């Protein structure tokens, strides 16, 4: 029986295979084990991948918008951005707040008098950094912006700098989506107010204005009305012809005191409903 492989239980069994100790039988056994191991490993990888996709689908109601891979966190390389990051990180640990307003210069540059009048009383902390892309938000969420007590609500307004850097609307939307996934993972009990990108450039037919509209059409599908609420508050900035006037936006990107006053009047009721719905987990 030299070199024969038996299937059955014996004192020297490995599973249900008995191998007589010859070079040929050992080689055959190793071949069988290798094939079974590879098959099992492939099955494990498939299960893990599908589980990851299922988890992402459970967290958000929108799928990824491109096939370019998930955006990666990126640190700011300039001194001003890093100093502003440090101030925000200190504020989240030392300043009482209930809502974190993440954004770029449109958030950081919010008229301070109007902020103190309308947003500060609602417990909103300004976490905007001028020049930020979606990648930068991802990075700072993992480097101190969430180091304080968990926020009850998060307001997110980001993406216009991505578009200005000639990123596609789809890739910009993927960056926003990645932020939402991270926020849902890190702050599962918080409600997120996802703001549509605000209009820029004077004409409704301008390239970046159209790109803003494309991004908004994509990201609105990421809202479920419960954990993530979507709102477009920028239309109030436009005149009857859809144009952005210098009175509300002198450079057709950033806003004047009048522009921020108009935005605040549009944001306040949305924010109030969001916070009021935090206990019932339903915004109506």
Task: List PLM regions with ranges.
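Oxyanion-hole/transition-state-stabilizing segment in secreted/luminal serine hydrolases
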Residues: 108-120, 134-177, 182, 193, ...
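Catalytic His-Asp segment of secreted/periplasmic serine-dependent ester chemistry enzymes
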Residues: 199-284
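N-terminal secretory targeting modules
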Residues: 4, 14-101, 106-113, 117, ...
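Extracytoplasmic/secreted proteins, especially bacterial periplasmic and envelope-associated proteins
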Residues: 101, 132, 136, 167, ...
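Short amphipathic alpha-helices and their capping/turn segments at secondary-structure boundaries
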Residues: 86-100, 139-147, 181-184
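Intrinsically disordered, low-complexity proline-rich regions
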Residues: 9-12
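A short beta-strand-loop structural module common to alpha/beta enzyme folds
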Residues: 123-132
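A short helix->loop->beta-strand "cap" motif at the edges of active sites that frequently abuts
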Residues: 187-190
């Amino acid at each position: 029986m030299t070199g024969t492989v038996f299937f059955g239980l014996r004192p020297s069994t490995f599973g249900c295979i008995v191998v007589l100790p010859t070079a040929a039988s050992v080689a055959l056994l190793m071949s069988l084990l290798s094939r079974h191991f590879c098959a099992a490993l492939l099955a494990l990888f498939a299960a893990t991948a599908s589980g990851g996709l299922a988890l992402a689908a459970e967290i958000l109601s929108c799928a990824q918008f491109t096939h370019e891979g998930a955006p990666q966190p990126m640190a700011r390389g300039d001194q001003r951005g890093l100093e502003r990051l440090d101030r925000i990180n200190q504020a989240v640990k030392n300043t009482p707040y209930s809502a974190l307003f993440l954004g770029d210069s449109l958030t950081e540059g919010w008229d301070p008098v109007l902020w103190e009048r309308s947003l500060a009383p609602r417990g909103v902390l300004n976490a905007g950094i001028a020049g930020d892309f979606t990648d930068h938000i991802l990075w700072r969420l993992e480097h101190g912006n969430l180091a304080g007590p968990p926020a009850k609500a998060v307001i997110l307004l980001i993406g216009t700098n991505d578009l200005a850097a000639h990123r596609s609307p789809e890739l910009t939307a993927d960056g926003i989506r990645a932020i939402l996934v991270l926020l849902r993972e890190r702050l599962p009990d918080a409600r997120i107010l996802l703001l549509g990108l605000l209009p820029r450039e004077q004409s409704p037919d301008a390239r970046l204005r159209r790109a803003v509209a494309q991004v908004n059409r994509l990201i609105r599908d990421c809202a479920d009305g419960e954990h993530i609420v979507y709102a477009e508050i920028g239309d109030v900035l436009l005149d009857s012809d859809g144009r952005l006037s210098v009175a509300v936006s002198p450079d057709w990107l950033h806003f004047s005191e009048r522009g921020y006053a108009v935005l605040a009047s549009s944001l306040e009721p949305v924010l109030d409903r969001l916070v009021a719905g935090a206990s019932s987990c339903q915004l109506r």
